[in-house]
């Protein structure tokens, strides 16, 4: 009986440690998602009227999952401390929802990468052509693109040189830069999503083991 209670206590503390880590991970995920969505150059691009909102769906899901992770981390600590099967069962269900959300984020980031790249490239080409037709019409949009991706023009930068960053050294094709930068960012989002999903699996295992151990301890008593 003493060994059984010792094992139960060990599992409980493991779950408490997991929930602390999970809470911290949730905070990091929220900070990461908000910085990616509203920080720096991405903020400038997202302010455009033609901004592809679906491009940010993965980030919205990531931030929402991060907030849920923080709440669930606290919820799981309460369940472990009180040794409540009901609370632990609810905790497992919440982890399952977070797992699904994070997997969705990761899959969307990897699979939707090509669509997002093509959409932003099309936006740039439209702004580029508008500028060539009317130097005032697409001026602001083109400046935003060039500043965001630190590039200038397509095959040549001579026709759009006034809209290019002054600090830019040499010529960088915007079509290529858009593909490179968006690909890297979405891969990072996907890796974070899948990584958190993997962490969630351990939480589900710990919660179920503790729940079963609590039930068995009560049966023994």
From Swiss-Prot:
Q: Which UniProt keywords apply?
A: Glycoprotein, Membrane, Transmembrane, Transmembrane helix
Stretches assigned to the Cytoplasmic side: 1-13, 76-90, 210-221
The keyword Hydrolase belongs to this UniProt entry's keyword annotation: no
- For whether the record's keyword set contains Protein biosynthesis, the answer is no
Its membrane topology, per UniProt?
A: Multi-pass membrane protein
Please give the CDD domains that the UniProt record associates with this protein: CD81_like_LEL
From the Swiss-Prot or TrEMBL record, give the protein name. Answer: Tetraspanin-2
What is the source species?
Answer: Homo sapiens
Its encoding gene is what? TSPAN2
